[in-house]
């Protein structure tokens, strides 16, 4: 597998709508996010490790009643449950061992929970960093099934459940918006999922339902998957609390103006709020699509 050895802060160099680029959490999203967790249930796919676990801890810290973690590894789930409950004993941690590609199992989880206020879609699959011709058909199918098809299916099933107040936080990737060498299928799968989330948000506008859908790049967070691609010291890593606390802000009421948009956790939220008028006037701003 080829590795990236550049020491340039590549992600910060990408054009963005805010002047300020955040690499760590800050008070505006850690304590003044506006999300009220009282009595709420949060379901997180891939929530037993990495970014998903950081997000789970953030919601527990915000006082939600229940956090349901859906992932494939029971051992990892049990470790995550112990960590969260030790720090936040008032939050109940529920574990569901399943693949996100199993739509029937996900439907039964939703039925068992009987009400989910926030769905965090964090599970993802990557492929070897090789040219497209060197990937197998099985590789391609697995990445699209996990990153695209399951995202659509889980969002479809969730929005069909009773209740009019639902929030979807889709953890995406910067490769959804740009070319990344030797990441062809991964990038395409992420872009497809963002497009689907944009359509979903539009479908619910004016229906009377409060269905909010946000896709976001979590930042450059070190995970086992990223460790297989980047050499030590090659990337200026962001703090995992950044996407975790950004998720709290997105789940709160102040982010309504970003419904259906694609953003980065690195973008300063006050500077995003300052763009509210432009977003109201330009339905294509901060979306994935054709640029003319």
Curated annotation (Swiss-Prot):
Pathway: Secondary metabolite biosynthesis
One Pfam family matching this protein: adh_short
UniProt binding sites for NADP(+): 44, 156, 186, 190, 221, 223
EC assignment: 1.1.1.-
UniProt-annotated catalytic positions: 172, 186, 190
Keywords: NADP, Oxidoreductase
Keyword Aminoacyl-tRNA synthetase: no
InterPro entries tied to this protein: NAD(P)-bd_dom_sf, SDR_fam
SMART domains, per the entry: PKS_KR
GO molecular function: oxidoreductase activity
Biological function: Short chain dehydrogenase/reductase; part of the ergochrome gene cluster responsible for the typical purple-black color of the ergot sclerotia. The ergochrome gene cluster produces several ergot pigments including the yellow ergochrome secalonic acid and its derivatives, as well as the red anthraquinones endocrocin and clavorubin. The pathway begins with the synthesis of atrochrysone thioester by the polyketide synthase (PKS) CPUR_05437. The atrochrysone carboxyl ACP thioesterase CPUR_05436 then breaks the thioester bond and releases the atrochrysone carboxylic acid from CPUR_05437.
Family according to the record: Belongs to the short-chain dehydrogenases/reductases (SDR) family.
Protein name, UniProt field: Short chain dehydrogenase/reductase CPUR_05418
Lineage: Eukaryota, Fungi, Dikarya, Ascomycota, Pezizomycotina
